[in-house]
Amino acid sequence: MRCSHKLGRFLTPHSCFWWLFLLCTGLSWSFADGNGDSSTYQYIYNLTICELNGTDWLSSHFGWAVETFVLYPVATHILSLGFLTTSHFFDALGLGAVSTAGFVGGRYVLCSVYGACAFAAFVCFVIRAAKNCMACRYARTRFTNFIVDDRGRVHRWKSPIVVEKLGKAEVDGNLVTIKHVVLEGVKAQPLTRTSAEQWEA
């Protein structure tokens, strides 16, 4: 578990890290020097969505694909501010779609780069989903506040205030003799005792 925690912290600096890197690469393509025969020019071209322009899948819809490619990471980043796990899922989904399109179109360099990013985003999603499930399980099955009576029975108790009647505590309508009170997982000590009066009309 410790290894997975470090891996998740390494891979998730931000939800849109991989998208931002690839977007900057695409912008740098516009300012690259040289002509179409330049190896640097061609290398940068292979790493952007422009590589899909000649495929059958995207040749007739390239305009909206570019708009989606720019707006999609912005949307996932905004989503990550409140829903990080969902953002990781959509990151993996979007990157996987580009990788699949590259594989179908025979653009294997593009496919491998985006596939690696999609896999990293999916790993982040799995780690976050596992942590969410563990947190939900802990919240539903682990209780840190409870009362132990003189018979060894454990009673759930949320309040730091215990009401006593005839020297016993009233728990769920029953009177029990307190042996220990545990708050936030730590054995508690009585702080103050206050007498109370009950009035009826």
Curated annotation (Swiss-Prot):
It is a multi-pass membrane protein. Glycans are attached at residues 46, 53. Keywords: Clathrin-mediated endocytosis of virus by host, Disulfide bond, Glycoprotein, Host-virus interaction, Membrane, Signal, Transmembrane, Transmembrane helix, Viral attachment to host cell, Viral envelope protein, Viral penetration into host cytoplasm, Virion, Virus endocytosis by host, Virus entry into host cell. It is found in: Virion; Virion membrane. Residues 1-32 form the signal peptide. Pfam families: Arteri_Gl. It comes from the Viruses. The chain crosses the membrane at residues 64-84, 109-129. GO terms for biological process: clathrin-dependent endocytosis of virus by host cell; virion attachment to host cell. Residues 33-63 are virion surface. N-glycosylated. GO terms for cellular component: membrane; viral envelope; virion membrane. Heterodimer with the membrane protein; disulfide-linked. This heterodimerization is required for transport to the Golgi complex. Interacts with glycoprotein 4. Interacts with host SIGLEC1; this interaction plays a role in virus entry into host cell. Interacts with host B4GALT5. Belongs to the arteriviridae GP5 protein family. Major envelope protein present in abundant amounts in the virion envelope. Mediates virion sialic acid-dependent attachment the sialoadhesin receptor SIGLEC1. This attachment induces virion internalization into alveolar macrophages predominantly through clathrin-dependent endocytosis. This is Glycoprotein 5.
